[in-house]
Structure formats: C-alpha cells, structure tokens
Amino acid sequence: MATIEDVYEFLKHTAPTYMLATVDEEGNPRVRPFGTADLFEGRLYIQTGKKKEVYKQIVAHPEVEICAWKGADWWRIQGELVPDERIEAKKYMLDAYPGLRKMYDENDDNTIVLYFRHATATFTSLAGKPSETVGW
C-alpha cells in the first residue's frame, strides 16, 4: 500500500520537477513547473514566494493539483494547500533546497511554505504497474 513517504520520494528523487495547477481570479486554470517538495512533521510541503501570482491564486483557491511523472509512471496529488508561517518550517525547506537561499530567507516577508491537507495522491503507470491511492 502506498504512503505519503512514497509520494515524497517520487517528488524529491524520481521526478523533482513537477507541474502545479491552480485557478486564477477569473476561474482559468494555470499550470507551472515547481521543484520543491519535502516532508516536515509528517506533512508534504512545497515552497514559493508570497509576491508571486501562484501564491495569490493559492490563497484565493487553496485546492490545487500536482502532476509529477517519469517515463510511464506518474503521481497526481490533489488537495488543499495550507500556508505555514513558522520560521522552523521555512528553515527546514530552505535547508533542504540551499540553492533557494539566493532568493529566499526564512526571516524575510516573502518566503512561504505550504503543506497539503485533505489530500489524495494517485499513482498510475502505463508500464503495467498497479495503480495506488493514498490519502492524508
């Protein structure tokens, strides 16, 4: 049975660039590549900047979907993203992605980390591997 750790491992090590889908203020879909994912306190986190349109879209419509793929395998993660303003959560993510420190700092007003709540992740494969679903 799949776990949140399986989803994390795929995002972090197998398909480190994934697509994040949001909805803009007019209800139009918006999709862009993302590259941050980590587990902190048992939750799946991503990171962005508060000044970005993607963050404004998440605040207005927190239901998002991620699609990460490698070859014939992919995970789709659908759920609500919840901002976490705690310094320790921001520091954890930035320590996991030290290259981001050129643009972000856990003490600045721009850095934000978000975790998935009420999420469902579905694994699919065109290579004959069994489909799996995990929720948290």
Over which residues does each language-model region extend?
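A short, Trp-centered hydrophobic/proline-enriched beta-strand micro-motif
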Residues: 10-25, 64-66
